A protein has these predicted regions:
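Catalytic machinery of carbohydrate-active enzymes
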Residues: 1-217
Length: 217
């Protein structure tokens, strides 16, 4: 996406590997010293102000303190999204165990967040979709005990913050855009034969449907 605007292509030894490794090839070309991929870190900015803001929003929404799981139900391509009914079933399982669930994401995720919250019908579900800035979203994820989503941007916040996480992949490929460098991640690949097609449109959407709530839970 956007690669068509590049005026000079730089090909490195990782041209078919994870996108971060490709970016590091560009960094090497520009003179940066990258000794080992094992040394790659993703430092985050000071989020103390945003942490206080997020905790206030959580408390206003009924959070009683303690651990919470963050679920981000949206993705840039609709084909990458896990079905809302699957999220509802998962949230019911989590809240039945007494686990607080915080739904998060941008304004485009608000309808999905509302449906999941209403479908779960539990006071342990807090819907903050569309109610945080990007930095507040990072702070929210920093404070969580666990993170769950499909292939979407906030997933990489969770990986950078070294959070335990579950990431679900259907039309996209985890070896290309998966949670990089995370030792606490569980990547669930769709069992569908068409998985990894990289299509933004689909007639059946089997791949994400075939990842069941039981597999995630």
């Amino acid at each position: 996406e956007g690669s068509g605007f590049i005026s000079k292509a730089i090909g490195g030894s990782h041209s078919k590997d994870h996108v971060i490794e490709r970016y590091l090839d560009v960094a090497r070309y520009l003179g940066a010293k990258v000794d080992s991929l094992d040394d790659v870190e993703f430092p985050m900015p000071d989020l103390s102000k945003e942490t206080a803001s997020v905790q206030h929003k959580l408390q206003e929404a009924g959070w009683q303190g303690g651990d919470y799981v963050v679920i981000v139900p949206g993705a840039r391509w609709w084909t990458k999204e896990w079905p809302v009914e699957h999220y509802i079933e998962l949230a019911k399982k989590l809240t039945a165990d007494g686990t607080a669930v915080v739904l998060a994401g941008g304004p485009d995720d608000a309808v999905k967040g509302q449906k999941i919250a209403e479908g779960t019908a539990s006071s342990l579900v807090i819907d903050l979709t569309g109610q945080t800035s990007l930095r507040e979203l990072a702070a929210l994820i920093k404070g969580c005990s666990f993170y769950i989503s499909a292939d979407t941007g906030p997933l990489h916040f969770a990986a950078a913050l070294k959070k335990p996480l579950v990431a679900m992949y259907g039309p996209t490929k985890a070896d290309r855009t998966g949670p990089y460098g995370s030792k606490n991640s569980t990547v669930l690949l769709s069992p569908a034969k068409c998985a990894g097609c990289l299509k933004k449109k689909c007639d059946n959407w089997h791949c994400m449907h075939d990842i069941t709530p039981e597999m995630v839970y």
